[in-house]
Amino acid sequence: MPKKNAISESTNSTPETAPAMTFESSLKELEQIVARLESGELALEEALSKFERGIQLARQGQQTLQQAEQRVQILLNDDTQSPLSHFSPDTE
């Protein structure tokens, strides 16, 4: 039986049937999709399909980042011994 390409399998999966992907693998797939879309070489239907998959991946990534941020906040709030201040990327 021929082996299928992992990326083509994941692009045809629905969110309900898709195997759990790491944040990094989702980001890598999203970057590949963006590159293919930017190349302008895809047929309309394939481009639309890739765009839909990209939106799914972007939403999954956003959710993963929000969950990570919540976990960090919980961990920081559990430490009552040290005073904390909000992080600002402009302040170093």
Swiss-Prot record:
GO BP, sorted A to Z: DNA catabolic process
Q: Which UniProt keywords apply?
A: Cytoplasm, Exonuclease, Hydrolase, Nuclease
State whether keyword Nuclease applies: yes
Q: What GO MF terms are annotated?
A: exodeoxyribonuclease VII activity
Disulfide-linked positions: none
Superkingdom of the source species = Bacteria
Classification via Gene3D superfamilies = Exonuclease VII, small subunit
**Enzyme class, broadest EC rank:** hydrolase
Reaction(s) catalysed by this chain, per the record, are: Exonucleolytic cleavage in either 5'- to 3'- or 3'- to 5'-direction to yield nucleoside 5'-phosphates
The answer on whether this UniProt entry bears the keyword Nuclease reads yes
**GO annotation, cellular component aspect:** cytosol; exodeoxyribonuclease VII complex
Polar residues biased stretches:
7-16
Where in the cell does this protein reside?
Answer: Cytoplasm
Q: Where is this region: Disordered?
A: 1-22
Coiled-coil zones:
none
Q: Which Pfam families match?
A: Exonuc_VII_S (PF02609)
InterPro entries in the record: Exonuc_VII_S, Exonuc_VII_ssu_sf
Family statement drawn from the similarity comment of this UniProt entry: Belongs to the XseB family.
The record's note on quaternary structure and interaction partners says: Heterooligomer composed of large and small subunits.
NCBIfam families for this protein: PRK00977.1-1, PRK00977.1-4, xseB
Protein name in the entry: Exodeoxyribonuclease 7 small subunit
Quick one: which gene encodes this?
Answer: xseB
